[in-house]
Design a protein with these regions (language model features):
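Conformational coupling and interaction surfaces
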Residues: 2-4, 18-24, 28-29, 163-170, ...
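Active-site histidine-anchored catalytic micro-motif
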Residues: 2-46, 50, 91-191
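Generic structural signal for helix capping and beta-alpha/helix-loop junctions
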Residues: 39, 69-71, 192-194
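Metal-dependent C-N hydrolase catalytic cores
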Residues: 45-115, 265-266, 275-294, 298
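Proline-centered flexible-loop/turn and helix-kink motifs
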Residues: 57, 115, 136, 180, ...
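A residue-level signal for conserved active-site and pocket-lining positions in enzyme catalytic cores
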Residues: 61, 175, 243
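Short, well-ordered secondary-structure micro-motifs
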Residues: 72-75, 132, 156-157, 195-198
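Short, surface-exposed amphipathic charged segments that create phosphate/polyanion-binding patches used
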Residues: 74-82, 158-162, 200-202
Length: 299
């Protein structure tokens, strides 16, 4: 039985790599929602749509939350992703895509959960949190894969939080309270997977397709940033690693835990005493994940 996914994306470079890998791996992408994060939400939706279309996927893309639950000001530009989330290679937002709250309402995500569609969330959890506020019963014991958390490494958010949690910590807290039971794939794990620059370069040299050339344009500054942050010659495709966790769960090890927001470090997650409310990925077969992602991306 093929994997069916609802995907939530904030339109960055690693989101694009994740979408391509999923579309080329036989996954049935049932629906996609966009959220603010690496760029503003309309741009994130446009990025997702053009990546999927160039990958041969016709899934509908909906425009979700443009700001977090607390409505804090959002800075659109992120180092490594650029103003449009794709370092100038993003889709055109001139075509207005349908909003998530019409015609389905945020019930679109609840419907996915009720129908047994798996979830993959690669940005701030605002859309999921809003959906859980309206229909909490739909998400009881749903186990979406969520790219979130930085436990023993530092992320790019204030206090060392990962960017997704830092962007809307209230949303993640709400999701944990709802009983969703997410499978968290933190930076501790995603930072162990490297896709080498040469793999992107060879693909760009061997293929002149618009998709490959756009990805090559997008990954350049992203690789530069990762070289400075993490070392090595390549990038840590954080969201693509989360996608790999949905695709190949046998390559990832999880531990049940009770997690919450650290009150002293804004947006940072910590393990605390209590009944498990999430599963935390603690180990990954990094070399095999890297190999499979490269094969999915470049053939």
């Amino acid at each position: 039985m093929s994997l069916r996914l609802h995907i939530d994306t904030d339109g960055g470079v690693d989101d694009a790599l994740a979408l391509v890998a999923l579309a080329r791996s036989g996954v049935e992408i049932a629906s996609v929602s966009a959220v603010f994060g690496n760029t503003w939400v309309d741009q994130a939706a446009s990025n997702a749509r053009w990546v999927l279309r160039l990958s041969g996927c016709a899934a509908d893309v909906f425009v979700g939350a443009e700001a977090g639950l607390a409505l804090r000001p959002f800075q659109h530009r992120r180092p490594g992703h650029g103003h449009d989330g794709m370092n100038g290679a993003g889709g055109s937002p001139r075509r207005r895509l349908p909003p998530l709250d019409r015609p389905h309402g945020v019930g679109l995500i609840a419907l996915a959960a009720r129908q047994g569609v798996s979830g993959l969330f690669m940005g701030p959890l605002t859309n999921l949190a809003r959906a859980s506020l309206e229909d909490p019963a739909a998400f009881h014991d749903w186990r979406p894969v969520v790219m979130a958390g930085a436990f023993d490494v530092d992320g790019q958010g204030h206090g060392g939080a990962d960017f997704n949690t830092w962007s809307d910590p209230e949303a993640l807290q709400r999701v944990l309270w709802t009983g969703v039971n997410p499978r968290l794939v933190p930076l501790d794990v995603t930072s162990k997977v490297l896709i080498e620059t040469d793999a992107f370069r060879r693909a760009a040299e061997n293929s002149q397709t618009p998709l490959v050339q756009k990805l090559w344009q997008a990954v350049g500054p992203y690789i530069d940033q990762h070289r400075a942050l993490w070392g090595g010659e390549g990038c840590r495709p954080h969201d693509a690693v989360a996608a790999a966790a949905a695709l190949w769960p046998e390559l990832f090890t999880y531990e049940p835990a009770h997690v919450g927001l650290d009150p002293n470090r804004f947006g940072r997650l910590e393990r605390i005493d209590g009944a498990p409310n999430a599963e935390i990925c603690t180990a990954v077969q990094a070399a095999e994940v890297s190999r499979r992602l490269a094969h999915a991306l470049f053939g």
